[in-house]
């Protein structure tokens, strides 16, 4: 029996498999970082790997709300860059 790894997107609030989401983690020193390995320790928030969720998340500040900390534009740009190739 395999264990499912479902997480909720901070933007659209849908439950999805962990692999379908980006993880942003708040590491020591209160610095948000994109965690592509899903293994960095710290408070994490998830957002879908599509441009609509990223745009909505930026507009609604959903990642900031989930992490209780500001998230820099560079992280959103990095996620968009990964999606667009």
What are these regions (language model features)?
Residues 1-2:
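Flexible extramembrane loops and terminal tails that flank transmembrane helices
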Residues 5-8, 41-44:
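Short metal-coordination and nucleic-acid-contact micro-motifs, chiefly zinc-binding Cys/His arrays
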Residues 6-17:
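Short cysteine-rich loop/turn motifs with clustered Cys
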Residues 13, 49-54:
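Cys/His-coordinated zinc-binding microdomains
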Residues 18-22, 54:
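Short, non-ligating residues that shape and space the ligands of small metal-coordination modules
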Residues 27-29, 49:
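Short acidic-glycine loop/turn motifs at beta-strand connectors
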Residues 30-42:
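Short linker/helix segments within small regulatory modules
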Residues 55-85:
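C-terminal structural segments of small proteins and small subunits
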């Amino acid at each position: 029996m395999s264990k499912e790894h479902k997480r909720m997107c901070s933007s659209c609030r849908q439950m999805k498999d962990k692999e379908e989401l980006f993880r942003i983690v708040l590491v020591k020193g209160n610095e948000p970082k994109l965690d592509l390995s899903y293994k960095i320790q710290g408070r994490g928030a998830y957002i879908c790997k599509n441009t609509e969720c990223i745009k909505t998340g930026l507009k609604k500040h959903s990642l900031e709300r989930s992490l209780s900390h500001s998230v820099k534009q560079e992280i959103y740009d990095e996620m968009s860059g990964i999606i667009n190739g």
